[in-house]
Design a protein with these regions (language model features):
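C-terminal alpha-helical cap/extension of soluble enzyme domains
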Residues: 5-16, 38-40, 200-203, 207-296
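A general structural signal for well-ordered alpha-helical segments in protein cores
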Residues: 28, 60, 64, 89, ...
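Active-site beta->alpha loop and helix N-cap motifs at the rims of alpha/beta catalytic domains
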Residues: 2-11, 15-144
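Alpha-helical structural signal in soluble globular domains
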Residues: 62, 66-71, 95, 99, ...
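Catalytic alpha/beta core domains of metabolic enzymes, predominantly
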Residues: 128, 142-248
Length: 296
């Protein structure tokens, strides 16, 4: 049985920007403190929600370093270092390890998507270049590449490929993956709304967008789900479902950044090609947020 990096809810943290679109490190520190004091179980930096795709190489490394330093060992820090260029992913992963990241999040190759054989070779090359645990990330709606249960089985043989962030919405495939891999591959939900269903199949939590705005509540939902407290987990899922879905009425992380701004944080805008929400969308988001949160 492999060691689990975290159990519960890890926040897929946004990257705040200044008006000139540079990284707002002062606000990033505030977000980190908000997460830790609210009970988040881990912090994922430079993932999809962190707009890693539009960070420069220098920014990417600096955000990882800043996050590790400010967290200061209070919760695990997982750095997004995946790429469709395996050599670059190796380089970035080694830098993240040297900076003190506790684990890596590795998205599947995208655009130049590969075969299952190539996927295993790529992930094994990256994992073999570091000693810290790696979480692979399956999000075919973005990458055009889906990890099959049989491929997961091959990946689970690699010692430091310890988990997957699963966002393919295929419960049947997940059941097969759990059957094949057992405790050699931890499963985390990659969708807030799927936390309870995936936990019922042995999942250990969620890497969450929703945690950006309600970390305490997402921690409680994930913890109840993993513990098998069905009554509590169901009640919390039902309670927050509409707000979770509202955070995806536009391309992630556009709505969640807007939500944080409405809460009084200063996260700024997303970098292009991600454009601001429409006034109509913002109005709908406010309605859902007002049911649970105090708006600025």
């Amino acid at each position: 049985m492999k060691e689990t990096i975290f159990t519960g809810a890890a926040v897929a943290l946004v990257t705040p920007f200044n008006p000139d679109m540079s990284v707002n490190y002062e606000e990033l520190e505030k977000l980190i403190e908000f997460q830790i004091t609210s009970g988040t179980d881990a912090i994922v930096t430079c993932g999809t929600t962190g707009e890693a795709a539009t960070l420069t190489d220098e920014e990417h490394v600096k955000v990882i370093e800043f996050t590790v330093n400010k967290v200061a060992g209070r919760v695990p820090v997982i750095a997004g270092t995946g790429s469709n260029d395996t050599a670059y992913a190796v380089e970035l992963s080694q830098k993240a390890e040297a900076l003190g990241a506790n684990g890596l999040l590795l998205v599947t190759p995208y655009y130049n998507k590969t075969s299952p054989r190539g996927l295993v070779a790529s992930f094994n090359r990256i994992a073999g270049s570091v000693k810290i645990p790696c979480i692979v990330y399956n999000v075919p709606s973005r990458t055009g590449l889906n990890i099959l249960p049989e491929t997961y089985y091959e990946l689970s043989k690699t010692q430091n490929i310890v988990a997957t962030k699963e966002a393919n919405h295929d419960i049947s495939a997940l059941i097969k993956t759990r059957e094949l891999c057992g405790d050699d591959l931890t499963v985390y939900s990659g969708e807030d709304t799927q936390t309870l269903p995936i936990a019922s199949l042995g999942g250990k939590g969620v890497i969450s967008t929703f945690s950006n705005i309600m970390p305490k509540e997402m921690h409680e939902l994930a913890t109840a789900s993993v513990a098998g407290d069905l009554k509590t987990a169901q009640a919390l899922t039902f309670k927050y479902l509409d707000l979770m879905n509202a955070l995806f009425m536009d391309v992630n992380p556009i709505p969640v950044k807007q939500a944080l701004n409405l809460m009084g944080f200063n996260c700024g805008h997303c970098r292009l090609p991600l454009a601001d929400m429409s006034d109509e969308q913002i109005a709908k988001l406010k309605v859902e947020m007002a049911k649970h949160l105090q708006l600025a």
